[in-house]
Amino acid sequence: MNRTVNRLTTIAGLACAGALSMTTLVQAQQVYPTVDAKLKPTADAFYTSPTSGELAAEVPGNVLRYRALPAASLGTSLKEGWQVMYRSTNTKNQPVAMVTTVLIPKAAPATGRKLLSYQSFYDSLTLDCSPSGQATSNTLLEKTFFQSALNKGYIVTMADYEGLESQWIVAKNSGQGVLDGIRATLRFSNSGLNALTPVGMLGYSGGGFATAWAAELAAGYAPELKIIGAAQGGLPVNPINVAKKVDGGFWAGAYLGAVVGLSRAYPELKVEDYATPEGIVAIKDIGTRCLTGSPNLLTAYAYKKGSDLLKDPNFLNLPEMQAINRENTMGQNTPKIPLQIFQSIGDQVMPIADVDSLAAYYCANNATLEYKPVAGTDHVLGAMGLSGGLTYLLNRFDGKVAPNNCK
C-alpha cells in the first residue's frame, strides 16, 4: 500500500515538475505588439537583450519573445510572418540573444512541413541593415532567392546571425546563431514545426560564411537537428586573405569592416590602439555602416588602403590578428551533411585558391560534396548560384541521392 502511495506521489510530483517547466517556458516566450515598421531596429525596444542572468537560465535555441510582422510587409505569398528572439551562444561561449524572421507561406501544408534556413548576405555593422529590419521595411531584395521555396510551401527562417552587436565575419557566433535560429523556429509554437522537421541551409557571401560555419559546427553543437544539406557560395574561407585581396580596391570597405566586426567579438583587440588619428574617426563611422544597405560601407571606403588608417602596414600579419584569423578560418571540421559549394573562379573578393583548398580538405575527410567552380562570373553575379543551391536542397528534401564529385 505504502509503495503504491509513494509511486503515485512520485508520478504526481514529476507531472507537477513537468507542468512547472512548461509554464516557465511559456512565460519566457513573451508576446510583443506587432512590429512598428516606422521604427528602425536600433530604436526598437524589441531588440533590447534580456539580462545575462535571464539568458543563462535558458538553453540554446529557446524562444525569449516574439511578435507578428505587419500585414503590409508580408506580400501576396505569405500567410504570416514573425520576429522571434532566441537564446544563442557567442564566440566566448557566453549566452546571447539573437533574432530570426520566420515566414509562413499560404501554401504551407497543415502537417509535414519543411524548413529552409536562409542566411542573408547582409554584412553589416548596424542592426538597421539586419534581415529582420529589412523584412519589416520591405527592403530585403534577397527574398527573390527563396521565393520559389515559399511558393512550394516551405517555411523560411532568416536569422540575424551576427547578433545584436552586429559581429560581422565571426565564425562561431554566426554558425551557432544560425543553428539556434533553426532550433528556435522549430520550438516556436506558431511555426507548425517540430523536432523531426527536415531542414536545409542556404547562403551566399557573408550568408555563405554563416551557412558553412553552421554546417561545420552542427554535429558538435546541434546534433539533434535533422539537416538534410547545406548549399553555400562566395565563401570568405580565410578572412585575412580576403582583406589582403581587396585592400586598396573597390571592395576595400570589406577589409575595414571586418576588422571592426572582429573587434566586437574579441574585445582584447582594441583596434583604436592600432589606428592613425584619421583611422580612429573612420572606425567609429564604419561601425554605423553595412555593405548592402545605407549608410553604405563600400561606397564610403572604396579604394582606401588599410595603411591609410592603421599605423602598422603589416597589421594583418600581427600575431594577435593571425591568432584571431585562425579561429575564423573554415576547414576546422568536416560537415557530416551533404554539401554544395558554388564559387566564381573570377571572384574579385574571395580567393578561389582558398575555396579550392577547403573543398579538398572536405573531400580528404570523406565529405559528400558537390563542388561547382563557375567561370565567367564575379562576386556579384556569383549570387545567381543561389538558384542552383536551392534546387540542390529541394532535391535533398525529396530524398534524391546527393551528388559527390570528390575524387
Model regions and ranges:
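Catalytic-loop region of hydrolases
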Residues: 28-109, 363
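Accessory cap/linker subdomain of secreted extracellular hydrolases
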Residues: 34-54, 235-332
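Short beta-strand/loop motif that positions the catalytic acidic residue
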Residues: 335, 340-347
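Histidine-bearing beta->alpha loop at or near hydrolase active sites
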Residues: 346, 367-388, 392
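Conserved alpha/beta-hydrolase "acid-adjacent" motif
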Residues: 348-354
